[in-house]
């Protein structure tokens, strides 16, 4: 009983914080309450609900060989340290979605998005990711379409594979558009991103051949290299020689992305994909952690009300009522069907032990939900006039914060 006392206290803190967030009407609410509520709920859910699913629903057996062990080929099936695999999986599921969706949903107020993210991820989103990962792992790392074909027949499997293909085309097109817009004519950004490729390959070779299993060492080396790439990128951008070399048009970047995808798909996963995703996690989690620490220190009040008049569906940022459009707008961070494709992709082929599945499947989704919470908080602490000016068409709300208020 004694070992459960800290978790009981954490749960009580979470309930109190969530109650303050939910029942406050009219008065100012501190952003710290949302952060405390989310962190407390996520910790308790991971400690008890994920453990319950693992033990009593899936009956996870750490002694049972995983596909990465049984079918190890050094290419796709590679037993990977769970810390690296967590970073790989988290980077794959946490793209722009958990940032963009909550920011857009803030036009309805902070309360709907907060409740949906917390309860959605704990009861559904993380469970889905965990379950699909486990099922794929037990079926030799089969993809979602193949799993459906095995369970429901050839016709259903073919339809699922075609649907998954179309979803991937659409999602990759959107993500590529974001990347191209961010890196076009930006030598600083392009150099930093390009530097992560040889850096990741060096990390992969280090843990594979030089110092196997030394994740702490390679993490420090990778972090130093990443910081150096970011800092040196400014000098590259200002250089009359190197600046033009790393300056590309949108069309050129499209071809570069296609070429990178083709090369990455044939290289061993331990050489590029896994270490590069792990490396990028430093930036993602580091930025979110810094934002969380800033909120804890500054404790800013939420400027956005709990509910706005735009819950009816006539908002200037996007049109649509609370139901169902809130749940469509915030998918990544709460419940995302796209994650089923990731959880049945490379990840189940890399798990070294079934005991790592809760951390990777359930835990990574909770981390993405925390990213979504921080994005929602970041949007909600802005003055509403500033928020709508930044996110709405000028034809609807004007060109300054005063006209948007």
Question: Residue locations for each model-derived region?
Answer:
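Membrane-water interface regions at transmembrane-helix termini and the short interhelical loops
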Residues: 18-25, 107, 135, 174-185, ...
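Hydrophobic alpha-helical segments and their helix-loop junctions in multi-pass secondary transporters
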Residues: 185, 204, 208, 224-255, ...
